[in-house]
Curated annotation (Swiss-Prot):
The keyword Glycosyltransferase applies. Homohexamer; trimer of homodimers. GO terms for biological process: purine nucleoside catabolic process. Its EC number is 2.4.2.1. This is Purine nucleoside phosphorylase DeoD-type. The active site is at 204 (proton donor).
Length: 233
């Protein structure tokens, strides 16, 4: 048990899917897993373990932003020995290369957060995912006929007050979208010798101002959930 997770040791499987929204974690457990069991609920941040096609897998919410995400990731790795962490979330696109409903694999994560500079003695950390997980995601997407978009994301500490004038510059550097956690997830996994990857479904396009309806968001997210579970099974 940790200050933020009240699961017993052994309740988490070595592979864990992460979502910012705990209700989305509950949704995945009920719709996609067999024998799903709630294993933690501190602060209503839910976690489940169950089976997908006979293989054990866990789910955990992590809240919003790098600070919240890295707390849960650290405790999952250090206390519960989780080895592979796959974040599935939504993002806002900033590049003409991607559109609504596209699934992005973040092969790098820049950030306006200071956390990685603090942990890396004020140097620039290359926050990148695990290659093996990335390869599995790519191969699984090919098998499922999913056109996976591959590029960098920008993990921002800001949801509303963001430097919109920087979008063109980010797109020039092959940043496809804005989200809020990948840079912290990757850095924590690197520090603690775990494997991590972030997949994001495009729910809004920050340049064209397009946005999915609530129904379309669910359908789009279901495709990413299937990809995530298939690559981990």
């Amino acid at each position: 048990m940790t200050p933020h997770i009240n699961a017993k040791i052994g309740d988490f499987y070595p592979q864990c899917l992460l979502c910012g929204d705990p209700l989305r974690v509950s949704y995945i457990a009920k719709k996609f897993l067999q024998d799903a069991k709630e294993i933690t609920n501190v602060r209503n941040m839910l976690g489940f373990s169950g089976k997908y096609k006979g293989k054990g897998i866990s789910l955990m919410g992590h809240g919003m932003g790098i600070a919240s995400c890295t707390i849960y990731v650290t405790e999952l790795i250090k206390t519960y020995q989780v080895k592979e962490l796959l974040r599935i979330g939504t993002c806002g696109a900033i590049s003409p290369k991607v559109g609504l409903k596209d699934i992005i694999m973040a092969i790098g994560a820049s950030t306006d957060s200071k956390t990685n500079r603090v942990r890396f003695l004020n140097h620039d950390l290359s926050a990148t995912p695990d290659f093996e997980l990335s390869l599995r995601a790519y191969q699984t997407a090919k098998r499922l006929g999913i056109d996976l978009k591959i590029g960098n994301v920008f993990s921002s500490d800001f949801f509303y007050s963001f430097e919109t004038h920087a979008f063109d510059l980010m797109a020039q550097y092959n940043h496809l979208a804005i989200e809020m956690e990948a840079a912290g997830l990757y850095a924590t996994a690197m520090e603690l010798s775990a494997k991590a990857l972030c997949l994001c479904s495009v729910s809004d396009h920050l340049i064209t101002k397009e946005a999915l309806s609530p129904k379309e968001r669910v359908e789009s997210f279901d495709n990413m959930i299937t990809l995530a579970l298939e690559m981990m099974s």
